[in-house]
Amino acid sequence: MVVKVGINGFGRIGRLVIRNALEAQGVEVVAVNDPFIPLDYMVYMFKFDSVHGRYKGTVEAKDGKLIIAGKPIAVFGERDPASIPWGASGADYVVESTGVFTTIDKASAHLKGGAKKVIISAPSADAPMYVCGVNLDAYDPRRPSISNASCTTNCLAPLAKVIHDKFGIVEGLMSTIHATTATQKTVDGPSNKDWRGGRSVNNNIIPSSTGAAKAVGKVIPSLNGKLTGLSFRVPTLDVSVVDLVVRLEKEATYDEIKAAVKEAVAGPLKGILDYTEDALVSTDFTGNTHSSIFDASAGIALNKNFVKLIAWYDNEWGYSRRVVDLITFVAQKDGNA
C-alpha cells in the first residue's frame, strides 16, 4: 500500500523529499503547502537544482495543481498549519519542513487539517526524535508528532552506535564541517542572535553551535552527556563531514574499528551506514543516499583508546531519503501501509 504524504514548506528539504519519494517508491506526495511560492515558480524550483541537477522527469502546472511524473499534487498557500486541508487531499502523513513549526504544539496544528501524523524534518525541543538504524525500536505510535532529528545527528548516531556497542565510548567531541544552508548570509548582514552567523558565507569559515552531538544522547540514552560538539560552516553548496574524536572503554586497533564498521555496513546498518577506503572529496558524495559514509583512510588513532573517526554525509539528499524511510517505517507500524 502506498503511503500518502503532504509537504509543508517547499524549500531544500521539501523539494528533495519529493525527489527521493519518487526514487524510493512506496511513498506518494499528494499535497504541498507553501504560502510564499506560487505554482508556476514551484514548477521552476523543482525542475532546476544547482546541486542535484535538473529533474529528469516531467513537471508542469495544470488546473491549479503541480504535476510531477504525471501525478497531480494539490497545492495550498496557507500560513496557518491548522488551515491546510490535508485530509481532503488524502495526505495521512505530513512532513513539516519549514523549520518553523518544530515543537509538538506547533507541529500538531497539522492534525486539525486531517493529518494523522507529523514528521518534523529538523531537531525538536520536545518531540521524540528517531534516527533510522539507531532507535526505531523505541517508536511509539501514540505520539502524533515526531522528529527525524538533524542531518548531522543522522550521520553521527549510526557511527557512534557501532563504536559504542563494540568498544564503548567514554566521552567524545564532534566537529562538523558543514556546507552552506539557506539561512546563511551571502554578504555580511544583521544576525542579532549569532553575530558570526551574520557574516558572508561566500568567503568565510564560520564557527557555529550545533546540538547534533548532544542529540545523540536522546536516541542512544547510554551516550547521554558523553558527547558534545560544534560546527564550522564552509562555502560549499552541499555535503558535510563529521570529525568524531572519542575515548574508548575497551582497547581497539584502528583495523579493529574498521572491521566493526564493515560488519555493521553489511548487516544491521546496510543502506544507512557505508564504508570507503577511496581517496574521496566532498563532491564525490553528492547524491549519496546513506546517512553516514565512514572514511577509513581519513581517520587516525593516537593509541588504542583515543581515536579520530571521519564520516561524510550529503546533508540534503541523504537526509531527505531518511525522511522517506522514516515515513515508510511509521506507516507500517501504524498499520497504514
Swiss-Prot record:
Residues forming the catalytic site: 151 (nucleophile)
Keyword Chaperone: no
GO terms of molecular function: glyceraldehyde-3-phosphate dehydrogenase (NAD+) (phosphorylating) activity; NAD binding; NADP binding
Sites where the protein binds NAD(+): 12-13, 34, 79, 315
Residues under site feature: Activates thiol group during catalysis: 178
Residues where D-glyceraldehyde 3-phosphate binds: 150-152, 181, 210-211, 233
Keyword annotations from UniProtKB, A to Z: Cytoplasm, Glycolysis, NAD, Oxidoreductase
Keyword Hydrolase: no
EC number: 1.2.1.12
InterPro entries xrefs: GlycerAld/Erythrose_P_DH, GlycerAld_3-P_DH_AS, GlycerAld_3-P_DH_cat, GlycerAld_3-P_DH_NAD(P)-bd, Glyceraldehyde-3-P_DH_1, NAD(P)-bd_dom_sf
Record Pfam families: Gp_dh_C, Gp_dh_N
Single Gene Ontology BP annotation: glycolytic process
Catalysed transformations (reactions): D-glyceraldehyde 3-phosphate + phosphate + NAD(+) = (2R)-3-phospho-glyceroyl phosphate + NADH + H(+)
GO cellular component: cytosol
Cysteine-cysteine disulfides: none
Involved pathway(s): Carbohydrate degradation; glycolysis; pyruvate from D-glyceraldehyde 3-phosphate: step 1/5
Family stated for the protein in its record: Belongs to the glyceraldehyde-3-phosphate dehydrogenase family.
Subunit composition and interactions: Homotetramer.
Protein name: Glyceraldehyde-3-phosphate dehydrogenase
Phylogenetic placement of the source organism: Eukaryota, Fungi, Dikarya, Basidiomycota, Agaricomycotina
